[in-house]
């Protein structure tokens, strides 16, 4: 025989009655009846569970409108701003490069109004959506033409599909990389309908290896920049200039996937060198692909530079339409590229470069300012220290190189890992979550990417 329902269940008001109460009118106007009804059902389910466990009504059942408003205020957006104190500047899971203010403004303008996405003001007819950005890229890199898609994986896939479907692609064995999300070059080639031909060895590949692999079915000679790992020691590799010369000699196009790609010499800012697309174009490579949201500091996009005859083939392929960038991406990319026309102001205007070049002394001073107020908040349960550390660029850029930085560390006085886990879990529930990293029994907050100290203190003191 089933148990009798708890008598307190009868004190829970009906949804329709609650929605018709005068106190609900402001909430109905703000959120609408569907969301309110769904949220009230959730609250009632929780109230029944509370009654079943404690045999009494929860305190919030005395004021349903207040409980409803509190629950609605706790709703989380799908994408939530966070403090990135992980020590990884271009963190893939945290959205990679923050956009420049001019790029944010350009995206906002593009969202608010009709724009000349595929409309030519000169001829009052249909234009090409890549044209304006392509012209900027050509001016900055010396390429003949450019093509924009929604990310670099799409750029590589489009390039392989158009240039070498049903043909062989020759690649050094040491460059068959896997990037995030199990994106493997051999798998991409297979999906694009290409036959992979591996040459050389993991650590040494010579020009003769490429030459010996060429036959009547060779469609492409390709290099892939190993942006997320490095092989050192007894190594040899074929330069882009050598490979381009071989391709021209044999009438076979050449391509390089740079992955990250920087339009400026990073050593100019005290950072490690990274291959630049314009260098490869000057070396004679036919097509070069790279990302928009890594070292470039722009939105997620895949950029393909190269010879006009090949870019036109890419633009005309049906797959290009499926992979094309939208107006917001193009607006942000256009605004970001314009910053490169003023290289002397780039550090000032491009957030990613500003964070990468931030002096260690400035970060240390930030740590000193934060230490005392955070000890006041957390000193009972944690020992707080200032420690030197190494930041990384992230997103597969310059994998070996590190940037000197400073961090605040939190060591639990009880020595328990569960205490650290509880702290990090609580910080993830903040209005603006604080994301650090746990290592060596401590929580590390690398301060390289912190630009609003007051906002961080407000969150951590809440």
Swiss-Prot record:
Known catalytic reactions: L-seryl-tRNA(Sec) + selenophosphate + H(+) = L-selenocysteinyl-tRNA(Sec) + phosphate
Cited InterPro entries: PyrdxlP-dep_Trfase, PyrdxlP-dep_Trfase_major, SelA-like, SelA_trans, SelA_trans_N_dom
Domain of life: Bacteria
Major localisation: cytoplasm
Gene3D superfamilies attached to this UniProt entry: 3.90.1150.180, Type I PLP-dependent aspartate aminotransferase-like (Major domain)
Residues modified as N6-(pyridoxal phosphate)lysine: 294
A GO molecular function held by the record: L-seryl-tRNA(Sec) selenium transferase activity
Enzyme kind, highest EC tier: transferase
Cofactor: pyridoxal 5'-phosphate
EC code: 2.9.1.1
Keywords tagged on the record: Cytoplasm, Protein biosynthesis, Pyridoxal phosphate, Selenium, Transferase
Biological processes, Gene Ontology terms: conversion of seryl-tRNAsec to selenocys-tRNAsec; selenocysteine incorporation
UniProt-annotated location(s): Cytoplasm
UniProt pathway: Aminoacyl-tRNA biosynthesis; selenocysteinyl-tRNA(Sec) biosynthesis; selenocysteinyl-tRNA(Sec) from L-seryl-tRNA(Sec) (bacterial route): step 1/1
GO cellular component: cytoplasm
UniProt record similarity statement: Belongs to the SelA family.
NCBIfam families in the cross-refs: selA
Functional note: Converts seryl-tRNA(Sec) to selenocysteinyl-tRNA(Sec) required for selenoprotein biosynthesis.
HAMAP family xrefs: SelA
Subunit architecture: Homodecamer; pentamer of dimers. Binds only one seryl-tRNA(Sec) per dimer.
Protein name in the entry: L-seryl-tRNA(Sec) selenium transferase
Species per Swiss-Prot/TrEMBL record: Yersinia pseudotuberculosis serotype O:1b (strain IP 31758)
């Amino acid at each position: 025989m089933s148990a009798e329902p708890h008598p307190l269940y009868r004190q829970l008001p009906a949804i329709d009655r609650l929605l018709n109460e005068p106190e609900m009118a402001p909430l109905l106007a703000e959120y609408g009846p569907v969301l309110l009804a769904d949220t009230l059902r959730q609250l009632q389910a929780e109230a029944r569970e509370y009654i079943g466990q404690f045999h009494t009504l929860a305190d919030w059942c005395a004021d349903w409108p207040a409980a409803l408003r509190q629950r609605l205020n706790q709703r989380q957006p799908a994408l939530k701003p966070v403090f990135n104190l992980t020590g990884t500047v271009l963190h893939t899971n945290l959205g990679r490069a923050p956009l420049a203010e001019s790029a944010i403004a350009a995206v906002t303008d593009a969202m608010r109004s009709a724009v000349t996405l595929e409309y030519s003001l000169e001829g009052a007819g249909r234009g090409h959506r890549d044209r304006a950005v392509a012209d900027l890229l050509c001016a900055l890199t010396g390429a003949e033409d450019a093509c924009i898609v929604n990310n670099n994986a799409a750029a590589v896939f489009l390039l392989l599909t158009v240039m070498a479907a049903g043909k062989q692609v020759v690649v050094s064995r040491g460059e068959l990389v896997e990037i995030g999300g199990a994106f493997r070059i051999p798998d991409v080639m297979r999906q694009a309908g290409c036959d992979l031909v591996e040459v050389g060895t993991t650590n040494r590949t010579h020009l003769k290896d490429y030459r010996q692999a060429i036959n009547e079915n060779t469609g492409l000679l390709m290099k892939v920049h190993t942006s997320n790992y490095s092989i050192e020691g007894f190594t040899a590799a074929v330069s882009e200039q050598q490979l381009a010369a071989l391709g021209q000699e044999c009438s076979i196009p050449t391509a390089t996937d740079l992955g990250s790609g920087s339009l400026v010499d990073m050593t100019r800012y005290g950072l490690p060198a990274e291959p630049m697309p314009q260098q490869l174009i000057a070396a004679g490579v036919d097509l070069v692909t790279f990302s928009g949201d890594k070292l470039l500091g722009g939105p997620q996009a895949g950029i393909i530079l190269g010879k006009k005859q090949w870019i036109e083939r890419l633009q005309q392929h049906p797959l290009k339409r499926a992979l094309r960038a939208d107006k917001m991406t193009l607006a942000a990319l256009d605004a970001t590229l314009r910053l490169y026309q003023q290289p002397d102001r780039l550090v000032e205007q491009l957030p990613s470069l500003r964070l990468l070049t931030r002096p260690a002394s400035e970060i240390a001073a930030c740590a000193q300012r934060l230490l005392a107020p955070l000890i006041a908040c957390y000193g009972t349960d944690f020992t707080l220290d200032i420690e030197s550390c190494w930041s990384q660029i992230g997103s597969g850029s310059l994998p070996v190189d590190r940037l000197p930085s400073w961090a605040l560390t939190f060591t639990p006085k009880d020595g328990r890992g569960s205490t650290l886990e509880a702290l990090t879990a609580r910080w993830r529930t903040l209005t603006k979550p604080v994301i650090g990293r746990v290592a060596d029994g401590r929580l590390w907050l690398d301060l390289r990417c912190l630009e609003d100290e007051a906002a961080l203190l407000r969150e951590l003191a809440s």
